[in-house]
Amino acid sequence: MPYTKKDLISMKDLSKDDIFDILRLALKFKELNKSPVKKADSLRGKTVINAFFENSTRTRTSFEIAAKRLGADAINFSSSVSSTKKGESLIDTIKNMEAMKTDIFVVRHASSGTAKFIADNASASVVNAGDGLNEHPTQCLLDLLTIYENKGRLENLNVAIIGDIFRSRVARSNVWAMKTLGINVKLFGPPMMTRDCEAFGVPLCSNIDEAVENSDVIIMLRIQLERQDGEPEFPSVREYSKFFGLTAKRMELAKKDVIIMHPGPINRGVEINSDVADDPKFTKILNQVENGVAVRMAVLDTLIKNRS
């Protein structure tokens, strides 16, 4: 049965069949994106507002391109110049934009749960483009598409997620979805950045070599310094790179056809060395970015059909 909900808030809301339906549709849109015209019309006459209350490069641009390629009017809302600076509440802001006949809100916010809060109070559809430490479902879907394209399957793969797991909404979405799909996930990072990981119900490795060993896919995560409070959680960048960074030498422990992924932005020489990040044999980071447009086209197309 196809995904029929009004919104996309969490990967927990998607069944295995839902995920594959979206990925199959994304593959069709990826073919469209290779054509000279790159245009469809399923969102013609519809309005998509990118309501981003946090900074973003890849996600916001990707959603804007996706909406426009489907024929929608895509509007970028910036909280820095909005009436929220004058004391207007979040819901009043959303209600005012909804009164302009908005069909879909794409929401990014620093507070976990904000996307669901908006979805519960709006008749327009809502896509969670990242809410605090909670989830980032479309990043997860583009990661899954990238893995599927490079491995030819999703089930029974070994995936290592390494870095600041505690603050990573990408890690949360990926773990929930990968468990649903039968992917073997293991986690690793500094102790303060892997606290509460037992809630995921997947193995937590004791060192990076254990995490990398026999992996089909390695997903590296940056240190989210902007979300840290108080004392630093590691002695220095040099120490972090030594014990938690991905190097060419460590790559030798993984499977020969391993692929490396990263949600971006990359901090070179910290969680990943440049020679690894730039190696076309292993690295699929730009492939992820490319797939982001197709996946977000698939999500927007699915939600607008659900509204019909």
From Swiss-Prot:
Spell out the SUPFAM superfamilies in the cross-references: Aspartate/ornithine carbamoyltransferase (SSF53671)
Keyword Cell wall biogenesis/degradation set for record: no
Name a single GO biological process.
'de novo' pyrimidine nucleobase biosynthetic process
Tell me which residues bind carbamoyl phosphate: R58, T59, R108, H136, Q139, G264, P265
Keyword Transferase found: yes
Q: Which UniProt keywords apply?
A: Pyrimidine biosynthesis, Transferase
Tell me the residue numbers annotated for binding L-aspartate.
Answer: K86, R169, R222
In which pathway does this enzyme or protein participate? Pyrimidine metabolism; UMP biosynthesis via de novo pathway; (S)-dihydroorotate from bicarbonate: step 2/3
Family, per the entry? Belongs to the aspartate/ornithine carbamoyltransferase superfamily. ATCase family.
Q: Which PANTHER family match?
A: ASPARTATE CARBAMOYLTRANSFERASE, ORNITHINE CARBAMOYLTRANSFERASE, MITOCHONDRIAL
Kindly state the subunit structure of this protein. Heterododecamer (2C3:3R2) of six catalytic PyrB chains organized as two trimers (C3), and six regulatory PyrI chains organized as three dimers (R2).
According to UniProt, the name of this protein is Aspartate carbamoyltransferase catalytic subunit
Q: Which organism is it from?
A: Campylobacter hominis (strain ATCC BAA-381 / DSM 21671 / CCUG 45161 / LMG 19568 / NCTC 13146 / CH001A)
